[in-house]
Amino acid sequence: MVYTITCNPSLDYGVTVENFQMGHTNRTVTEQMNVGGKGINVSIVLKHLGIPTKILGFTAGFTGREIEKRIKEQEIEAEWIRLPQGDSRINVKLLSNEGTEINGQGPDISKKEVQELEEKLGILTKEDVLVLAGNVQKSLGQTFYADMMKKLKDRQIRTVVDASGELLKAVLPYHPFLIKPNQDELEGLFQVKDRKSVV
């Protein structure tokens, strides 16, 4: 089984606007609402490929309920930890002359709720794969994935990490099975931006 963790899932509201003008009323040409989050996206693809997968994550408020509903409609197995306060975030994706994204912060997660997630990971075996993907809330800190890997290191669970910046850098001492940085994330990790910098 491939387990994916999405700490900060979202509803992504995508709109297309012709010739967007700042400070004016703009009318949308198209609109769509999708569930977002890197871990969720991994599970969606795995489901389409016929590979057993399960989403683990945190949801909150009315947006969280909508995320849960949409994942259930896709018949993807999931276990959610429902947060008592706040709402799961809404991200706005504006496509006009240029693409613009406005991403929400997401609700805070307490130590108690992190402990609930760790308990759910107790059933994983060395036959399973764990995917840690996407950003995390400020309340979790930039060592969250590293802390998870530290607790799992003696259980021989293959871990895949798709993250950036300090969140990615912090996991490297724990030797994840695979990391998936894009070009921008690699540039940030190694502080290089061109071939000259590499040389």
Where is each model-derived feature located?
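Positively charged, low-complexity intrinsically disordered leader regions
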Residues: 1-23
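Short beta-strand segments
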Residues: 4-7, 57-58, 93-95, 103-105, ...
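Glycine-rich beta-alpha junction loops
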Residues: 9-11, 59-60, 85, 185
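Short glycine/proline- and charge-enriched loop/turn segments
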Residues: 19-27, 180-183
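Substrate-binding N-lobe of the ribokinase-like
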Residues: 27-87
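Conserved phosphate-binding/catalytic loop of the ribokinase/pfkB sugar-kinase fold
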Residues: 83, 93-126
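Conserved beta-alpha-beta core of the PfkB/ribokinase-like small-molecule kinase fold
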Residues: 129-195
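Conserved small/polar residues in nucleotide/adenosyl-binding loops
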Residues: 198-199
